[in-house]
């Protein structure tokens, strides 16, 4: 029984190290996304996204969506992670939710990255400025 408890504790400790590493890598990806968004490099954001990223075929393209967000929110200067979730296994994902301060208004963002290479698989943003402007 003691051996089993030791193995469980060791497995938990090792997975905690992996999660901490993934949190830091995910935070770096969010910072990179904001740097590209602020610079107007929407093509690069789309090019670096996961090939499996699902975007509706009707309506604006992903690049047009990003351009509209940038135009309405302005420069996004800082952000704070509000939650982190990692789904392990085949097709796993890392999700980061954030409160972001932008020139026009604060925004709530949700990023979904593919496990491993952390390529953008999904993005959503909400803000009053996106609705009224």
Which positions does each model-derived feature cover?
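Sec-dependent signal peptide recognition
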Residues: 2-7
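C-terminal motif of bacterial Sec signal peptides marking the signal peptidase cleavage site
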Residues: 14-16
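Bacterial signal peptide processing site
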Residues: 18-20
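Short, aromatic-enriched amphipathic alpha-helices that serve as compact interaction elements
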Residues: 24-38
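Short solvent-exposed beta->alpha transition segments
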Residues: 27-28, 43-92, 99-102
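Short N-terminal helix-initiation segments at or just after the protein's N-terminus
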Residues: 37-46, 118
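Exposed beta-sheet edge and beta->alpha loop/turn motif
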Residues: 83-133
């Amino acid at each position: 029984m003691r051996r089993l408890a030791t193995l469980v504790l060791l497995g938990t400790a090792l997975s905690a190290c992996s999660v901490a590493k993934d949190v830091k890598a995910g935070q770096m990806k969010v910072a990179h996304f904001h740097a590209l968004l602020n610079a107007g490099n929407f093509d690069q954001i789309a090019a670096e996204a996961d090939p499996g990223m699902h975007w509706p075929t009707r309506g604006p393209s992903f690049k047009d969506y990003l351009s509209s967000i940038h135009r309405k929110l302005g420069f996004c200067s800082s952000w704070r992670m509000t939650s982190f979730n990692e789904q392990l296994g085949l097709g796993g994902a890392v999700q980061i939710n954030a409160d972001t301060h932008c020139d026009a208004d604060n925004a709530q963002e949700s990023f979904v990255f593919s496990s491993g290479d952390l390529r953008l698989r999904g993005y959503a943003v909400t803000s009053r400025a996106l609705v009224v402007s």
